[in-house]
From Swiss-Prot:
GO terms for molecular function: 5S rRNA binding; structural constituent of ribosome. PANTHER family: 39S RIBOSOMAL PROTEIN L18, MITOCHONDRIAL (PTHR12899), LARGE RIBOSOMAL SUBUNIT PROTEIN UL18M (PTHR12899:SF3). This is Large ribosomal subunit protein uL18. GO terms for biological process: translation. Part of the 50S ribosomal subunit; part of the 5S rRNA/L5/L18/L25 subcomplex. Contacts the 5S and 23S rRNAs. CDD domains: Ribosomal_L18_L5e. GO terms for cellular component: cytosolic large ribosomal subunit. Keywords: Ribonucleoprotein, Ribosomal protein, RNA-binding, rRNA-binding. This is one of the proteins that bind and probably mediate the attachment of the 5S RNA into the large ribosomal subunit, where it forms part of the central protuberance. It comes from Micrococcus luteus (Micrococcus lysodeikticus). Belongs to the universal ribosomal protein uL18 family. The gene is rplR.
C-alpha cells in the first residue's frame, strides 16, 4: 500500500494553516505559491476577495537576475513588499500555503521583511 504522498501532505498542511489565518483590509494575507521552477506571491484581502499586490519570478526584471532560485525568490519578496507599501499596506500575515518554511519560501519572507513589510 502506498503512502499518502507529498502533495496530499502539503494540502493537509495548507488546510490546517488556512483554518487559523485570514487577511483583512488592514492586515492582508501574503500568499506564497511555489512550483518547481517559479514563485508566485500575492497580497490578498480575504474580506473583499481582492488581490492588492502581486509579484512572481516570471517578471522580466526578476528573470534577468543572475543567481539561483533562492536569490530570485528573495527579490520577489522585495518586489511584493514595495508594491504593497505603494498600496498603503504596512503589515501582512504570512501564508506559506502548506509549504515548509525553508529555502525559497523563507527567502520570500526575508525579502518582504527587508522591503519594509511587517510579517
Amino acid at each position: 500500500m502506498k503512502g499518502k504522498g507529498k502533495f496530499n501532505a502539503r494540502t493537509r498542511r495548507h488546510l490546517r494553516v488556512r483554518k487559523r489565518i485570514s487577511g483583512t483590509t488592514s492586515v492582508p494575507r501574503l500568499v506564497v505559491n511555489r512550483s518547481a521552477r517559479h514563485m508566485f506571491v500575492q497580497v490578498v484581502d480575504d474580506t473583499q476577495s481582492r488581490t492588492i499586490a502581486y509579484a512572481s519570478t516570471m517578471e522580466a526584471d526578476v528573470r534577468a537576475l543572475e543567481g539561483d532560485k533562492t536569490a530570485k525568490a528573495k527579490r520577489v519578496g522585495e518586489l511584493v513588499a514595495e508594491r504593497a507599501k505603494a498600496a498603503g499596506i504596512e503589515a501582512a500575515v504570512f501564508d506559506r500555503a502548506g509549504n515548509k518554511y525553508h529555502g525559497r519560501v523563507a527567502a520570500v519572507a526575508d525579502g518582504a521583511r527587508e522591503g519594509g513589510l511587517q510579517l
